[in-house]
């Protein structure tokens, strides 16, 4: 589980960076939950996994921080939320014995292909698995964090590289080779900085200018991305360009959001249960 921390920086640098981001035209307006299609929508340019990885990548170097050990599980959580939002999976209904989000199993709703290799591979695993598993177990299985050798087949391999290749195909990243003394490493520097800055601006606005203080009134994908970015330990990258005052406000509001009780929020009207189930799984880990 990641933690939200305060930091001290030179205000001049943060103001300069903030001004640069705000100067970019926000061409893709946030969609309201009422207009959001839970199925495959051509309006959704990036998947949640692609957005999380893009936020975690160093722009020029083209790789995530070597010290970030949270992003792998964060990406797997993003896969589950993305599948739920596309109407492919859902949590079994609550019963007297299984009320908690983490006690309820992930069930298949539709096995129709999504067009995304990682999503379809995960969908295939969920369809073939008997007995069914919980959200927390699926995150562990997809990450490969299991002691059961018979469950290792469910591990998704080379996830970051495969997501990066998708972003290359979409014109947001490029592919390079870098030499690190004893070995060569494939990296993916950001080429479309406008798209990344648009994404960062959207998250910044969601906890600043457009803050609604009620997750049920937030855009579903923005809420999911905030939860995943926090769990993947990449939110510092998003907020580091803000002035100190705005940084503190953004971090405190995000902290309040991720510290809400998932069991309570998941039962509210129009709540996306999978978002809160994934958050509950990360809070427990």
From Swiss-Prot:
The keyword Transferase belongs to this UniProt entry's keyword annotation: no
Compartment list: Golgi apparatus, Golgi stack membrane; Golgi apparatus, trans-Golgi network membrane
GO cellular component: cytosol; Golgi apparatus; Golgi cisterna; Golgi cisterna membrane; Golgi membrane; trans-Golgi network
Phosphoserine, modified sites: 112
Positions of the UniProt region annotated as Disordered: 1-43
Keyword terms, alphabetized: Golgi apparatus, Lipid-binding, Membrane, Phosphoprotein
One Pfam family in the UniProt entry: GPP34
Main subcellular location of this protein, as a coarse class: Golgi
Feature: compositional bias, Basic and acidic residues: 10-43
Positions of region (Beta-hairpin required for oligomerization): 176-187
Positions bound to a 1,2-diacyl-sn-glycero-3-phospho-(1D-myo-inositol 4-phosphate): 67, 76, 157, 160
Membrane topology listed for this record: Peripheral membrane protein
InterPro entries in alphabetical order: GPP34-like, GPP34-like_sf
One MF annotation (Gene Ontology) recorded for this entry: phosphatidylinositol-4-phosphate binding
Quaternary structure, from the entry: Homooligomer. Does not interact MYO18; differs from GOLPH3 by its inability to interact with MYO18. May interact with ARF1.
Family: Belongs to the GOLPH3/VPS74 family.
Protein name, UniProt field: Golgi phosphoprotein 3-like
Species name: Rattus norvegicus (Rat)
């Amino acid at each position: 589980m990641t933690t939200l921390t305060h930091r001290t920086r030179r205000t001049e640098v943060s103001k300069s960076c903030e001004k640069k981001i705000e100067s970019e035209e926000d061409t893709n307006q946030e969609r309201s939950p009422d207009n959001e299609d839970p199925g495959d929508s051509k309006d959704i340019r990036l998947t949640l996994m692609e957005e999380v990885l893009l936020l975690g990548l160093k722009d020029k170097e083209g790789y995530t921080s070597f010290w970030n050990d949270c992003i792998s599980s964060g990406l797997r959580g993003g896969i589950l939320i993305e599948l739920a939002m596309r109407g492919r999976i859902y949590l079994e209904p609550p019963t007297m014995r299984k009320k908690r989000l983490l006690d309820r199993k992930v069930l298949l709703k539709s096995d129709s292909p999504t067009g995304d290799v990682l999503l379809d591979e995960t969908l295939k695993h969920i369809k073939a698995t008997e007995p069914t598993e919980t959200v927390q177990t699926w995150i562990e299985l997809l990450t490969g964090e299991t002691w059961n050798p018979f469950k290792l087949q469910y591990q998704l391999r080379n996830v970051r590289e495969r997501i990066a290749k998708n972003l290359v195909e979409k014109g947001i990243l490029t592919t390079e080779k870098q030499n690190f003394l004893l070995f060569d490493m494939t990296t993916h520097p950001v080429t479309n900085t406008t798209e990344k800055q648009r994404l960062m601006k959207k998250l910044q606005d969601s906890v600043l200018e457009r803050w609604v203080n009620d997750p049920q009134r937030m855009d579903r994908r923005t809420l999911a991305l905030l939860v995943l970015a926090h769990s993947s330990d990449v939110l510092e990258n998003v907020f580091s360009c803000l002035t100190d005052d705005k940084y503190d406000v953004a971090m405190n509001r995000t902290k309040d959001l991720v510290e809400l009780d998932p069991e309570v929020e998941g039962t509210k009207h129009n709540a996306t249960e999978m978002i809160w189930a994934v958050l509950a799984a990360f809070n427990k880990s």
